[in-house]
Amino acid sequence: MELARHSFQQPLNVAPSLSNVVNKTSVVLQQQSVIQPNQHQLQHQLQTMHDGGIDGKRREILARRPSYRRILDDLAGDGPVKMENYDDTGSSGESSPNGNNEEDINGINQSVSHQEKQYQSIHLNGIVSSVQGGENSLNQLHDSQPGDNQYIITTQGPDNKIQAYTIKGTLPIGLDNTSLASPHQLAEEATRKRELRLYKNREAARECRRKKKEYVKCLENRVAVLENQNKALIEELKSLKDLYCSKGD
């Protein structure tokens, strides 16, 4: 009976082990089936992000092109220069008469140089600055009309052409109306300063001569005192010599 009972219990123990093996294999297969779709989805997302970044850069470049065209149009002014027209696809169509980019660039340079040579009016409330290139130097700065806060800068270029700039606004800190003088007033101010410097030099030389005379008088008095003392010593020596000679006899 015990042997038969033992034989009946063995199938009962084997059955759970087989069920465990089946469950494990099903789990492994299920995990593999889950991992593979995740890898494909990740690659698809990376590819989508990469394509989206390229499209974003392309749209940004296309969005910038009209601003460049507007800036160059502002620089060209009313000149004959015409810029390229860009559409949404990024293609460009030249609208210059001869289709030559070098002529367009030369026209831009000529228009810019022409604008630099013209007189300009500057409205500011701060430090006075020059908008001209490095060729011209500031020569004069004077008030055009008192009380209207309008000043004129006169410059002279390398070709000896005088140009003027009008500045409207309040004076900066440290700059007053006294410094905004005409050339005649500036010359008078320079002459006055030179005369004042010469006057101070003459006064210093006069004081030096006076002190020199006083020093010479002091030396002369000292010499006279020393001469008197020398004479007194000579007479005293003579008297001592006579006294010694008389005692010797």
Swiss-Prot record:
Q: Name one GO cellular component term.
A: transcription regulator complex
Q: Which gene encodes it?
A: CREB
According to the UniProt record, where is the region Basic motif?
192-217
| Annotated localization | Nucleus
The Swiss-Prot or TrEMBL record describes its family as follows: Belongs to the bZIP family.
Q: Which organism is it from?
A: Hydra viridissima
Ordered alphabetically, the record's keywords are:
DNA-binding, Nucleus, Transcription, Transcription regulation
The region called Disordered is annotated at 73-106
Q: Mostly located where?
A: nucleus
Classification via InterPro entries: bZIP, bZIP_sf, CREB1-like_pKID, Leuzip_CREB
Q: How does it assemble?
A: Binds DNA as a dimer.
Q: Is Transcription given among the entry's keywords? A: yes
Pfam families linked to this entry: bZIP_1 (PF00170), pKID (PF02173)
TM ranges: none
What's the protein name? Answer: Cyclic AMP-responsive element-binding protein
Start-end of Low complexity biased regions: 90-100
> What are the boundaries of the signal sequence?
none
